[in-house]
């Protein structure tokens, strides 16, 4: 199922920097048991930028194997160079994933024409569904609704993860792209309103540690029950902020370790583990979210 409550899954690691497959399997089972609708493996939150391509593919293969058809798996396939994106996409297509999620190229600042050519080339390299990912806070490139609408004409580009936090884009994207084009929020703090305005799902960081509560909030919003959605969203609101007290996924890895979901909070350089000054803040907001820490 490619709608609803989707987790942007962390990639657990051992202290030597290798992938912790035992913890990875626990995470997949945890999300299946908690009712999460789909998993994004090796996206931004999964540290795609610091994994070698062989590691990237291996993690996706493991998640697909652990999932065993019980939950949909979406693989990150973002790349700064189109040729690299095509190569990665063709390799990921052999893993059994249900879809792929590709962030806009970053740093090299392509024009709208370049963005369209980039995503079209990647989509044309496979039959597997592709989801665009717009996150200008990280890429310094804001893919405009008109560009997304042009890409929506490509048969296997099925949706966009919109992480600007601007919920007014929901109506514009729906009008430009049609009812069948999937609209995902990539911003936990505005996700409730995004869904109430007609979005289809949320690809969430907080979902790593509060999947059941986040699923209830999403289901309420998707059904149009604004009052119930607000009640559950309010419980999680402090957590949304504290999970970004340092660069994602630093805080969510630390929180996952505190909950015993992963063996340790190791994160690859140039990111470092959560600064001690933020431990109290995160613990307090975890308690507010009714987590036992």
Curated annotation (Swiss-Prot):
One of its GO terms (molecular function) is 4-hydroxy-tetrahydrodipicolinate synthase activity. The keyword Lyase applies. It is an enzyme of class 4 (lyase). Keywords: Amino-acid biosynthesis, Cytoplasm, Diaminopimelate biosynthesis, Lyase, Lysine biosynthesis, Schiff base. Pathway: Amino-acid biosynthesis; L-lysine biosynthesis via DAP pathway; (S)-tetrahydrodipicolinate from L-aspartate: step 3/4. One of its GO terms (cellular component) is cytosol. It catalyses: L-aspartate 4-semialdehyde + pyruvate = (2S,4S)-4-hydroxy-2,3,4,5-tetrahydrodipicolinate + H2O + H(+). Transmembrane segments: none annotated. CDD domains: DHDPS (cd00950). Catalyzes the condensation of (S)-aspartate-beta-semialdehyde [(S)-ASA] and pyruvate to 4-hydroxy-tetrahydrodipicolinate (HTPA). Belongs to the DapA family. This is 4-hydroxy-tetrahydrodipicolinate synthase. It comes from Shewanella denitrificans (strain OS217 / ATCC BAA-1090 / DSM 15013). The gene is dapA.
């Amino acid at each position: 199922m490619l709608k609803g409550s989707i987790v942007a899954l962390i990639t657990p690691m051992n202290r030597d920097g290798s992938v912790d497959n035992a913890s990875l399997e626990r995470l997949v089972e945890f999300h299946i048991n908690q009712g999460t609708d789909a998993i994004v493996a090796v996206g931004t939150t999964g540290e795609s930028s610091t994994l070698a391509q062989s590691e990237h593919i291996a993690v996706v293969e493991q998640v697909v194997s652990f999932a065993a058809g019980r939950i949909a798996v979406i693989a990150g396939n973002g790349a700064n160079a189109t040729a690299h994106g095509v190569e990665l996409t063709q390799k990921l297509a052999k893993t059994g994933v249900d879809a792929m999620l590709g962030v806009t190229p970053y740093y090299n600042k392509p024009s709208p024409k370049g963005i369209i050519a980039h995503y079209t080339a990647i989509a044309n390299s496979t039959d597997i569904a592709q989801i665009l990912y717009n996150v200008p806070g990280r890429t310094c490139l804001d893919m405009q609704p008109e560009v997304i609408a042009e890409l929506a004409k490509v048969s296997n580009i099925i949706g966009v993860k919109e992480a600007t936090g601007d919920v007014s884009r929901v109506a514009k994207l729906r009008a430009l792209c049609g009812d069948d084009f999937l609209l995902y929020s990539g911003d936990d703090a505005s996700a409730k309103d995004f869904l109430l305005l007609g979005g289809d799902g949320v690809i969430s960081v907080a979902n790593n540690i509060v999947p059941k509560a986040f699923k209830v909030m999403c289901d309420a919003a998707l059904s149009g029950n604004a009052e119930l959605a607000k009640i559950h969203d309010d419980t999680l609101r402090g957590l949304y902020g504290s999970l970004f007290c340092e660069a994602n996924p630093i805080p969510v890895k630390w929180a996952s370790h505190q909950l015993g979901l992963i063996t340790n909070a190791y994160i690859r350089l140039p990111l470092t583990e959560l600064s001690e000054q933020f431990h109290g803040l995160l613990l307090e907001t975890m308690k507010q979210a009714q987590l036992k820490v």
